């Protein structure tokens, strides 16, 4: 009887062991398989390099070729190509040099943002120098500029100016990253310097954007004014208001 029970016990143990081996083999066959794919999670704002290209992007690395958008920038007046912070830049003389983009933003009906890397020379830190603007009939729809009156960077409309109040005064010969954003819903214009919010105010512009975005000058009373004296690189245009995180990301690194 004892032998019989010993035999039954041995068979039971072998059965359990065999079942365990079979389970492990089944699992092993699927070890290299991936689990059922979940829906991809969208990148958080500021982490998707493609989204930061914008509707237009001109690196200005020895040419006006666009990396986003359909139109290249055309340099006019006294300009030359120089080294820049990320590969090259367009140098403007402060008298006649600027660049046309052939591109428009809907600054009256849509949120928008503009950004550029800029460097001023030491020749004139008391005047107005505009890095980016968009022509209206008589005056620019916006100005991303240096204000000699305030001795600092500014994002401006006709009759309204957001000055960089949270940063030190700009130094000639140093590169800065400037971003101007506008929300139609909140009527909020904001200026960022090197990825950080530097100024904000509530304002509206009555100027219709009848012309193109221009690099290196502005328009006032029907005349071209405020020519940039220094260098400009990596110009971006957006048909939306960038988030603070996106601005910080763009300032730190250009998209691929």
Put a short name on every predicted segment.
Residues 91, 156-158, 192:
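A general beta-strand register signal
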Residues 108-109, 171-172, 209:
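Surface-exposed loops/turns
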Residues 2-96, 185, 199, 248-256:
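Extracytoplasmic low-complexity segments
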Residues 201-231:
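Flexible glycan-contacting loops in extracellular carbohydrate-active proteins
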Residues 51-55, 62-72, 83, 95-153, ...:
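Extracellular glycan-recognition modules
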Residues 173-182, 191:
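Short tryptophan-centered beta-strand motifs in secreted/extracellular beta-sheet-rich domains
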Residues 102, 153-177, 222:
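Short, aromatic/His-centered strand-loop micro-motif at the edge of beta-sheets
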């Amino acid at each position: 009887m004892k032998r019989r029970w010993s035999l039954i016990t041995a068979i039971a143990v072998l059965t359990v062991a065999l079942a365990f081996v079979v389970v492990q083999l089944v699992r092993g066959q699927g070890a290299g398989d991936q689990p059922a794919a979940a829906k991809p999670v969208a990148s958080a704002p500021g982490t998707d390099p493609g989204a930061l290209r914008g509707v237009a992007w001109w690196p200005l690395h020895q040419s006006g070729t666009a990396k986003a958008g359909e139109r290249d920038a055309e340099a006019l007046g006294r300009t030359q190509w120089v080294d820049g912070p990320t590969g090259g830049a367009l140098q403007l003389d402060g008298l006649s040099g600027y660049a046309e983009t052939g591109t428009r933003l809907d600054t009256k009906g849509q949120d928008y943002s503009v950004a550029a890397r800029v460097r001023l020379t030491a020749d004139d830190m008391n005047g107005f120098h505009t890095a980016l603007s968009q022509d209206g009939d008589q005056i620019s729809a916006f100005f991303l500029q240096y204000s000699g009156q305030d001795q600092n960077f500014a994002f401006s409309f006709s009759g309204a100016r957001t000055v960089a109040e949270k940063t030190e005064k700009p130094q000639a010969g140093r590169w800065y990253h400037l971003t101007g954003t506008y929300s139609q819903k909140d009527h909020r214009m904001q200026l960022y310097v090197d990825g950080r919010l530097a100024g904000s105010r509530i304002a509206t512009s009555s100027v219709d954007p009848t012309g193109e975005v221009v690099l290196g000058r502005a328009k006032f009373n029907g005349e071209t004014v405020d020519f940039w004296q220094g260098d400009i690189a990596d110009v971006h245009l957006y048909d939306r208001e960038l988030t603070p995180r996106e601005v910080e990301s763009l300032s730190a690194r250009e998209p691929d």
